[in-house]
Amino acid sequence: MIGPAATREHDKFHIKKHISEEVNFKDVTEDLTCLGLYGPNSRKLLSNISNDDFTNEGIKFSHGKFVNIDGVKVWAQRLSYVGEIGFELYTNIDESKKIFLAIIKEGKNHGLSPCGAHAMDIMRMESGFLHWGHDISPEENQYQAGLKFAISYKKNINFVGKEALLKIKDQNPTKSLAMMVLKDNRPGEPLLLHEEPIYLDDKIIGRTTSGNYSFNFKKNISFGYVNSGNTIENLINKNLSIEVEKKKYPVTIIKKPLNQKNIKDI
C-alpha cells in the first residue's frame, strides 16, 4: 500500500480490517516517491524522456504500467486530480531525484511550472472533484455526495458496504452535496474555507465543506451539504447565501462543474 499523509493510517486500518488471512499486506509508503505531472503537455514531455507509449491507446485513463525513464523503472498511472490529462509517477525513493531532474530539464521546453497544494485544490474544485476529509468522510455516503455512479450492483459480489448501501438505495438522502458560486467574484473576498453556514433566506439549511477562488473562471467556488427537504433542483434560483464573518454573500447553485473537459479519451 502507498498512502497519502492525511489518510495513510485510516486506509491501512480499513484494508487490514477487511482482507483475509490469505492476503499479504505491506505498507511501502516510505519506500517510494510519487511525482505528479499534470497538464496538456504532460504526455508530450514524458514521451520525450521515455521510449514508452503514453498515448491514449498506450495507457488509458485510470490504468497504469511500468515504464523506463532515464534508465529508471517507474510505475506510471494515468490519473489526475486537476481536471487535465496527467500522470502519477512512482519510483524508489533513492531514484526519485534523478526522475525529478529529468522532468525539470525537459519541462523547460514545455512551460513546466511547480504546482502547490492550493493550486491543485482550486483546479479540482473547478472540475467538481471531491476532497477526502472535507467533502466526503465516514459521515457521508455515495448517495449524499453525488457519487452513486461509482456503485454497481450488477455483479454478484458482496463488496464491503453493499448491505448498508442497499438499505438506503431507494431512500431520500438526509443531505445532498451542492456546488455553488458566489455572485461576488473578487479574489479572496470573502476567504472561503469550510464550515460556513448556508442560508435559504434567513434559515440555515447546511454548511460548506470546501471553498476557493478560481483564477481560470474568475469565480469564488464553494461546495457544501444542504439538509433533506431542500433538493438541489428546488434550490436553483432561490435566495441562497453563505455567511462569512457575520456577513452573508449571495450564491448560485451550479448543476455542472465549471471545467467539463473530457480527460478520459484524449
What is the meaning of each model-derived region?
Residues 2-266:
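Conserved, structured C-terminal
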